[in-house]
Amino acid sequence: MIIDKLYENVEKKGCVCVGLDTDISYLPKGFLNKFTNIEDAIFAFNQRIVDSTFDVSACYKVQIAYYEAMGIKGMILYKKTLEYIRKKGGIVIADIKRGDISATAKMYAKAHFEGDFESDFITLNPYMGMDTLEPYKDYFKNKEKGVFLLLRTSNEGSKDIQYLDLKDNKKVYNKVGEKIENIGKEFLGNCRYSSIGAVVGCTAEENNIRKELKHTFFLIPGYGAQGGKAEVAKYYLSGGNGGIVNSSRGILLAYKKYDEEGKNFEECARNEVINMKKTLQII
């Protein structure tokens, strides 16, 4: 199963997931000026980030919104970025956050697990109900695909719904977590984690969430620019390999710490990943 490949990558390369949420404003001006169009510039930037971090990163998360906002040309850029990573043998998480009734979900599955926009994992929103997962299950079993379901996210507004108290002294996200854990047991890899993972932000700590979801691999956003703490992320990593920690702006804009002109932006990105790995290392 695909979760075994991701688990193995974490063992070999560390737990960092590089986020390619690439905005045109992130590109150094000197680099951008070498190109006649925005799409070529961003693709070249993405390539250099991937090449410089490939041996020290577990995987890459590509946020589709940054590409959708550019229209048709942006979606071609999105396709090229996914293909570039996968052809190198890398693992791609398409951050699409879909969630819909089964007939529509079937089309989302086809769109993002096959064809032009094929990826290894996608993010989904389970709050319409677990029946929305049904069209994806064949891909988990037979086509080496996986998902990360939104559980407890890193944004401030997550408290509006996810943190609501229930009658049994649990919160909404605890109940959703129980369902994710139970459904995931059907798709366990050799690593004993499921190809159905969960998105758990490291901007807030919750001790029981890791203990209760023993077979659920975590995608951990919020580190760095969003204020997520390394201590929280480490706990969710479950001894070093129970999840991946995503950073986007912190890596893509690392050059601004050392070299405002960004002449060596890819080297700065690599160093940021290495520093993240050291900070997150379980001692």
Swiss-Prot record:
Which superkingdom?
Bacteria
Identify the metabolic or biological route this protein is part of.
Answer: Pyrimidine metabolism; UMP biosynthesis via de novo pathway; UMP from orotate: step 2/2
- Keyword check for Cell cycle, yes or no: no
Q: Its GO biological process terms?
A: 'de novo' pyrimidine nucleobase biosynthetic process; 'de novo' UMP biosynthetic process
Full protein name:
Orotidine 5'-phosphate decarboxylase
* Gene3D superfamilies named among the record's database cross-references: Aldolase class I (3.20.20.70)
Matching entries from SUPFAM superfamilies are given as:
Ribulose-phoshate binding barrel
What's in the keyword line of the UniProt record? Decarboxylase, Lyase, Pyrimidine biosynthesis
Lyase keyword on record: yes
Protein family (similarity comment): Belongs to the OMP decarboxylase family. Type 2 subfamily.
Tell me the InterPro entries matching this sequence: Aldolase_TIM, OMPdecase_type-2, OMPdeCOase_dom, RibuloseP-bd_barrel
> Pfam families under this entry?
OMPdecase (PF00215)
Task: Please name the taxonomic classification of the source.
Answer: Bacteria, Bacillati, Bacillota, Clostridia, Eubacteriales
NCBIfam families attached to this UniProt entry: pyrF_sub2 (TIGR02127)
Task: State which Enzyme Commission number(s) the record gives.
Answer: 4.1.1.23
Q: Does the entry annotate any disulfide bonds, and if so which pairs? A: none
Q: Name one GO molecular function term.
A: orotidine-5'-phosphate decarboxylase activity
Name the residues annotated as catalytic in the UniProt entry. 97 (proton donor)
What catalytic activity is recorded? orotidine 5'-phosphate + H(+) = UMP + CO2
Q: What class of enzyme is it?
A: lyase
